[in-house]
From Swiss-Prot:
Any single biological process term in GO: D-xylose catabolic process
EC number: 1.1.1.307
PANTHER family per record: ALDO/KETO REDUCTASE
Organism: Aspergillus terreus (strain NIH 2624 / FGSC A1156)
Protein name, per record: Probable NAD(P)H-dependent D-xylose reductase xyl1
Domain of life: Eukaryota
Site description Lowers pKa of active site Tyr, residues in chain: K79
Name of the encoding gene: xyl1
Keywords: Carbohydrate metabolism, NAD, NADP, Oxidoreductase, Xylose metabolism
Enzyme superclass (EC): oxidoreductase
Pathway: Carbohydrate metabolism; D-xylose degradation
Length: 320
């Protein structure tokens, strides 16, 4: 069964479920992407900062070469890192990332964070991370979001990106962006799970015709190995009584319940797994529904707990 899609304001269809490439190891990335394509995944969510786009592209190339999928059947996402927000740096880095993936265009290219950092030449260090000097210090660029977005729009004009979007933006930043955007953002990617539901932001984006994609759908799980304090001090969502009881009732896994909690509300998800069974399970987002009372009960777990915060990684960039 084909994965359901969301119609973007750019006119393109985006799969409701994709495969996220954050923290996918370089030595296994190509195989994981290849296996995910075989399992039915068509959207792959990458980024400069993940440092594995070359390997992800190798997995894509293998699947295409073997006739498993055509390029036009895939939806490849990448992101503009903070160090490349200056207007004259956007297109060159996008072209580098396209070359890394081995493709001619991105289906979606996203501004990763609403913060411009000092430029780091890819020949010096790539990906550059948060610190221009690599010592944990933060140096900002003077590029405005408007300058960056104007350069992003040029990517659409030149057919390097079919759609462009933003990530980790607040409602206020979206409001400002929409005042001057010639090409409206097609998507907003945010941290979204029962511990951080951000209902007003989601509602505003959807009202403006901007599709919402949730990352870290399983809450603290992805952050435990990073030893983020918030993640180690909270009950895992997979073990929460509310989530477990709903899963038991429907004969589903807690992971499936958490993903359906998002997709049933029109929010796309980008989980990852190297387990073949879980790969397939994570695609099962149709054919069953949560009751509204169950959605409400899961949503009621919201405590405004954010895990993906630069400050949590020791980088003083107070964007949240």
């Amino acid at each position: 069964m084909a994965t359901p899609t969301i119609k973007l304001n750019s006119g393109f269809d985006m799969p409701l479920v994709g495969f996220g490439l954050w923290k996918v190891n370089n030595d296994t990335c190509a195989d994981q992407v290849y296996e995910a394509i075989k399992a039915g995944y068509r959207l792959f969510d990458g980024a400069c900062d993940y440092g594995n786009e070359v390997e992800a592209g190798q997995g894509v190339a293998r699947a295409i070469k073997e006739g498993i999928v055509k390029r036009e059947e895939l939806f490849i996402v990448s992101k503009l890192w903070n160090s490349f927000h200056d207007g004259d740096k956007v297109e060159p880095i996008c072209r580098k990332q396209l070359a890394d993936w081995g493709v001619d265009y991105f289906d979606l290219y996203i501004v990763h964070f609403p913060v411009a950092l000092k430029y780091v030449d890819p020949a010096v260090r790539y990906p550059p991370g948060w610190s221009a000097k690599g010592d944990g210090s933060i140096e900002f660029s003077n590029a405005s979001i408007q300058e960056t977005w104007t350069a992003m729009e040029t990517l659409v004009d030149k057919k390097l990106a079919r759609s462009i979007g933003v990530s980790n933006f607040s409602a206020q930043l979206l409001m400002d962006l929409l005042r001057y955007a010639r090409v409206r953002p097609a998507t907003l990617q945010i941290e979204h799970h029962p511990y951080l539901t951000q209902p007003r932001l989601v509602e505003y984006a959807q009202k403006e015709g901007i599709a919402v994609t949730a990352y870290s759908s399983f809450g603290p799980l992805s952050f435990l190995e990073l030893q983020v304090p918030n993640a180690t001090n909270i009950s895992p969502l997979f073990e929460h009584d509310v989530v477990k009881s709903v899963a038991d009732k429907h004969g589903k896994t807690p992971a499936q319940v958490l993903l359906r909690w998002s997709t049933q509300r029109g929010i796309a998800v980008i989980p990852k797994s190297n387990n073949p069974t879980r790969l397939s399970q994570n695609l099962e987002v149709t054919g069953w529904d949560l009751e509204q009372s169950e959605i409400d009960a899961i949503s009621a777990l919201d405590i405004g707990l954010r895990f993906n915060d630069p400050i949590g990684y020791g980088m003083y960039v107070p964007i949240f």
